[in-house]
From Swiss-Prot:
SUPFAM superfamilies: YbjQ-like (SSF117782). This is UPF0145 protein AZOSEA16190. It holds the Pfam family YbjQ_1. Signal peptide: none annotated. Gene3D superfamilies: Hypothetical protein apc22750. Chain B. It comes from Aromatoleum aromaticum (strain DSM 19018 / LMG 30748 / EbN1) (Azoarcus sp. (strain EbN1)).
Amino acid sequence: MLMTTTPTIEGRTIRSYHGVVAGEAIIGANVFKDMFAAVRDIVGGRSGSYEKTLRSARETAFEDLAEAAGRLGANAVVGVDIDYEVLGEKNGMLMVAVSGTAVTVE
């Protein structure tokens, strides 16, 4: 599945539009809370384990996006937008949401 943040795919022609599709993934409360605690503890550094968790959530959201587009008969998604949103009681969860337009390209 081709996915791009641009409204078109260079060298390809969009033959049909199938509608807006989305994918989401949520990182649970403990992971998000621990992530900030770890960042405070390693000022100026990076936390590989938390970056890996966030990367995994983003990949899950993109997999959901591709599946949604595929169910509509699309072979690409254009205009992809990636958002991160803090949710829940005491802002204890992080949602990664991706959306775009499912299309068929040649």
